[in-house]
């Protein structure tokens, strides 16, 4: 699972979940991508589950890029504990996916395989997504 090596502070405030994504809105590495259309927290377990679903369908062909990283901790207090007595323990790590953000990219497979692999991955995620190509979004081209 993905989590940061070290953090400056163990516990943080909850991140904002309003507005559109400021960066990471273009397909830069691969040919096809999975773009978020709604806002939600995505946990490191959900990211890993989506990655496994994609790579199993592609039979380890092609290449997958994970374009989000869960660098924000979320905390939770134990069950049946009274209010107060400080913030709870870190329960896991989340990434905030806002509309427009590219979550995964794929290259090295044809469009039908990429579309189905990203569809399987989208079922593991709590956000609504859409399939995008590099040409549609105007990403960089690697022509030399």
From Swiss-Prot:
It holds the Pfam family Ribosomal_L16. Residues 1-19 have a biased composition (Basic residues). GO terms for biological process: translation. It comes from Staphylococcus saprophyticus subsp. saprophyticus (strain ATCC 15305 / DSM 20229 / NCIMB 8711 / NCTC 7292 / S-41). It comes from the Bacteria. Part of the 50S ribosomal subunit. GO terms for cellular component: cytosolic large ribosomal subunit. Residues 1-23 are annotated as: Disordered. GO terms for molecular function: rRNA binding; structural constituent of ribosome; tRNA binding. Belongs to the universal ribosomal protein uL16 family. Keywords: Ribonucleoprotein, Ribosomal protein, RNA-binding, rRNA-binding, tRNA-binding. The lineage of its organism: Bacteria, Bacillati, Bacillota, Bacilli, Bacillales. NCBIfam families: rplP_bact. This is Large ribosomal subunit protein uL16. The gene is rplP.
């Amino acid at each position: 699972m993905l989590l940061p090596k070290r953090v400056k502070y163990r516990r943080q405030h909850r991140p904002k979940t309003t507005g559109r994504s400021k960066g990471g809105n273009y397909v830069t590495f691969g040919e096809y991508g999975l773009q978020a259309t709604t806002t939600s927290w995505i946990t490191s377990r959900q990211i890993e589950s989506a990655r496994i679903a994609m790579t199993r369908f592609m039979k380890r062909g092609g290449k997958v890029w994970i374009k989000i990283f869960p660098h924000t901790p979320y905390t939770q207090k134990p069950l049946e504990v009274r209010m107060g007595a400080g913030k709870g323990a870190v329960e896991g790590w989340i990434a905030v996916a806002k509309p427009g953000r590219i979550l995964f990219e794929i290259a090295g497979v044809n469009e039908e395989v990429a579309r189905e692999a990203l569809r399987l991955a989208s079922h593991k995620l709590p956000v609504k997504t859409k399939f995008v190509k590099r040409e549609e979004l105007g990403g960089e081209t690697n022509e030399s």
